[in-house]
Curated annotation (Swiss-Prot):
Belongs to the Casparian strip membrane proteins (CASP) family. It comes from Arabidopsis lyrata subsp. lyrata. One of its GO terms (cellular component) is plasma membrane. The chain crosses the membrane at residues 58-78, 104-124, 139-159, 192-212. Glycans are attached at residue 170. This is Casparian strip membrane protein 6. The lineage of its organism: Eukaryota, Viridiplantae, Streptophyta, Embryophyta, Tracheophyta. It is found in: Cell membrane. Homodimer and heterodimers. It holds the Pfam family CASP_dom.
């Protein structure tokens, strides 16, 4: 009888130990499931932010690429503008070129500087696409972008006054319009001015894009 009781006690202890192991195993599985669900939730909330950040960086690169064409194209169009006509009334050869007017020279220099900077900033913009956590380089680009925006805007504004006088003249100052004689010259400078103002708009969008990108870091 004592041996039977001893065997029953041992079996009961074994059953209790097995039940305790089962309980511990169930708790471990629940903990692992909870950790897995939490990690999956973290991934779900992180991926959309990463995609948006990359999209902002790609948009910034595209804007810079178009701004390169706008600034360099305007500088080349203005810098190669010249025209010669023969005045039938005075029988003399009249020549005009952009370097005759200081405001147009400033326009060319401003757009050339901005275009050169934008070309150099393209590799950095590509780097930002693959490294969305970069912050210092974004701050530097934002500061220089703002300076280039001011430079191109001032150049375009100064050239606008000259182009207006070329088309309309100024009767008060007794300045006749020259576009009646130099129509090709006026068409070129007007076209380059339009391209420069498009570059100004693109630079504004670049600054806004850079500011948004920084605010998300």
């Amino acid at each position: 009888m004592e041996e039977a009781k001893h065997i029953e006690a041992v079996e009961a202890k074994q059953i209790e130990a097995e039940e305790a192991q089962r309980i511990k195993a169930g708790e471990a599985k629940q903990i692992e499931a909870g950790e897995t669900s939490r990690s999956s939730r973290k991934v779900i909330t992180f991926e959309p932010k990463l995609v948006i950040n990359k999209g902002i960086s790609v948009l910034g690169f595209v804007l810079r690429l178009f701004a390169v064409f706008g600034t360099i194209g305007s500088a080349l169009a203005m810098g190669t503008t010249h025209e010669s006509v023969v005045s039938l009334s005075q029988l003399v050869l009249l020549k005009v070129k952009y370097s005759d007017l200081p405001t147009l020279m400033f326009f060319v220099v401003a757009n050339a500087i901005a275009g050169g900077y934008l070309v150099l900033s393209l590799p950095v913009s590509i780097f930002h696409i693959f490294s969305t956590k970069a912050k210092t380089s974004r701050i530097i680009l934002l500061v220089i972008d703002t300076v280039m925006l001011a430079l191109v805007s001032s150049g375009a504004s100064a050239a606008t006054a000259t182009v207006y006088l070329a088309h309309e003249g100024n009767t008060t100052a007794n300045w006749p319009p020259i576009c009646q004689q130099f129509d090709g010259f006026c068409e070129r400078i007007s076209g380059s001015l339009i391209g420069s103002f498009c570059a100004v708009i693109l630079l504004m969008l670049i600054v806004i894009n850079s500011a948004i990108s920084l605010s998300r870091h």
